[in-house]
Regions:
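Conserved short histidine dyad/triad with adjacent acidic residue
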Residues: 1-16, 42, 49
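Conserved "cap/hinge" positions at secondary-structure junctions
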Residues: 16, 33-34, 52, 60
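Short beta-strand segments in beta-sandwich/barrel cores
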Residues: 28-31, 47
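Ligand-binding loop in jelly-roll beta-barrel domains
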Residues: 52-73
């Protein structure tokens, strides 16, 4: 999955029993969770386990975009 700077943030909805493993392959990814005050910034090589129930918003921080691998469980 590739996220471009020009795109609106992409939504990722996880239900209560779902999780997703996110790994950034290139660029810098901006990530926020609806209802939470803190944003996260992940660089190439970093990974994160996302837990539901939640809605996450994903976006790129620079013109090169962000390339990521997302595996839902």
């Amino acid at each position: 999955m590739t996220v471009a700077l020009e795109q609106a943030p992409q939504a990722l909805h996880l239900r209560a029993w779902e999780s997703a493993h996110l790994r950034v392959r290139g660029g810098t990814l901006w990530l926020t969770q609806d209802g939470k005050p803190d944003d996260l910034f992940l660089a190439s090589g970093q990974q994160l386990l996302l837990l539901g129930p939640a809605c996450y918003r994903l976006g790129a921080l620079d013109r090169s975009g962000a390339e990521l691998i997302l595996q839902k469980n």
